[in-house]
């Protein structure tokens, strides 16, 4: 299907509570990034005209699934998907895809300041049981993992949220895939569903402050984005984190206002 704005979409459905789920048809990374930016702007404008509000806030409500932006990806060469074996019917990925997957997992922690770019982003990972992963792992059609083989020849990265900058996330994903292929990084076996796997890779930072430091001190990130962009992005995010740390929240008032030690 195509919209009037030439944004190809595969399907749309009502997700949980007041959330909606839209799947874009796969395309080149740059075009998909353009379409995501355009689509979010369209949503805001249409909501304004209808007198309602749309939010892409990653975690607006506790106990309910947040707003994710799962990135489904594959690599193609000469019109063929390098992540799938032609004619093979069972759920699978190729050795090429395994190495690319290894790169995604290897660099997941360093990329979190982009995948989850706000203070609120990390509330998705702390609210257990909502299919937002908090470990660096993968699985075959396992929605609890940070990377899921959702179909033969396709990887689904579940870490990014709906406020993500797709140009930055796509740049880091491409760099991670490239490094995985170049080094032949082994992602290890997929754990059984519902069973925590071994910690083969650096753990995810679970606050924006930790994520920014991992990002800013990563030689790999600097190689992917360049020093100028890395430093500028880190400066903005450190400021955001500092302002949050200096704010007094409703939770603190409820917890400590009447506290008598």
Which residues fall in each region the model found?
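Acidic-residue sensor for enzyme active/binding pockets
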Residues: 2, 6, 21, 156, ...
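Acidic, glycine-enriched catalytic cores built around paired aspartates
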Residues: 193-261
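Active-site capping/gating regions of soluble enzymes
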Residues: 30-201
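Active-site acidic/histidine clusters and adjacent loop/turn architecture
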Residues: 14-38
């Amino acid at each position: 299907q195509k919209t009037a704005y030439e944004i190809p979409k595969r399907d749309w459905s009502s997700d949980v509570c007041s959330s909606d789920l839209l799947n874009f048809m796969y395309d080149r990374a740059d075009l998909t990034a353009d379409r995501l930016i355009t689509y979010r702007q369209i949503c805001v404008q249409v909501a304004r005209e209808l007198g309602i509000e749309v939010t892409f806030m990653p975690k607006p409500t506790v106990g309910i699934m947040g707003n994710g932006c799962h990135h489904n990806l594959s690599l193609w060469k000469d019109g063929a998907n390098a992540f799938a074996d032609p004619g093979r019917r069972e759920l699978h990925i190729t050795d090429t895809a395994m190495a690319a997957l290894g790169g995604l997992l290897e660099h997941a922690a360093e990329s979190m300041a982009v995948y989850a770019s706000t203070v609120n982003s990390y509330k998705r990972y702390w609210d257990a049981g909502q299919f937002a992963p908090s470990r660096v792992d993968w699985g075959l059609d396992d929605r609890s993992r940070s990377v899921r083989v959702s179909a033969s020849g396709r990887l689904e990265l579940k870490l990014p949220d709906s406020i993500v900058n797709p140009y930055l996330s796509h740049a880091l994903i491409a760099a991670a895939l490239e490094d995985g292929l170049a080094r032949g990084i082994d992602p290890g076996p997929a754990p059984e569903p519902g069973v925590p796997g071994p910690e083969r890779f650096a753990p995810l930072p679970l606050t924006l402050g930790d994520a920014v430091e991992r990002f800013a001190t990563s030689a790999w990130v600097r190689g992917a984005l360049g020093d100028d962009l890395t430093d500028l992005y880190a400066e903005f995010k450190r400021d955001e984190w500092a302002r949050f740390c200096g704010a007094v929240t409703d939770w603190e008032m409820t917890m400590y206002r009447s506290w008598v030690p």
